[in-house]
Amino acid sequence: MHTRAIYPGTFDPITNGHADLIERAAKLFKHVIIGIAANPSKQPRFTLEERVELVNRVTAHLDNVEVVGFSGLLVDFAKEQKASVLVRGLRAVSDFEYEFQLANMNRRLSPDLESVFLTPAEENSFISSTLVKEVALHGGDVNQFVHSEVATALAAKLKLAKP
């Protein structure tokens, strides 16, 4: 175990599916960097700083995990962090085509950067940040899909957003 890996994403918010993949990646790699993207093409509910804080809380028990916000190209962030592996999650066959294209683009931009795909535990295979936000927005209980601190933060965020 000698590799630095990056698990990139928007994490808006971090779900139990994300947390499961982070825990498993932490067992596979010496150091895992959770790269939280400041993706300008998306309009996240949580600020970059809030997302970094929530992921830090959820992963606090993992000594070899570091949480870093970033903007720009993922391959540049990987070089900056001296990472040689990208960890990506595949929930369903529908994720594969996009992830395959992304892996090939990343390989073209940075030939030494390898993509590794992990599938979630069955109980997490349907969870997405988008679905969690939708359930919460309509008053549903999201505690089975996210860490309790995330559920609390999401409820507060949605309450503030209501007119």
Curated annotation (Swiss-Prot):
It is found in: Cytoplasm. Keywords: ATP-binding, Coenzyme A biosynthesis, Cytoplasm, Magnesium, Nucleotide-binding, Nucleotidyltransferase, Transferase. The record marks H18 as: Transition state stabilizer. Pfam families: CTP_transf_like. Its cofactor is Mg(2+). One of its GO terms (biological process) is coenzyme A biosynthetic process. ATP binds at T10, F11, H18, G89, L90, R91, E99, N124, S125, F126, I127, S128, S129, T130. Disulfide bonds: none annotated. Its main location: cytoplasm. GO terms for cellular component: cytoplasm. It catalyses: (R)-4'-phosphopantetheine + ATP + H(+) = 3'-dephospho-CoA + diphosphate. InterPro entries: Cyt_trans-like, PPAT, Rossmann-like_a/b/a_fold. The keyword Magnesium applies. It comes from the Bacteria. Homohexamer. Belongs to the bacterial CoaD family. This is Phosphopantetheine adenylyltransferase. It comes from Shewanella baltica (strain OS185).
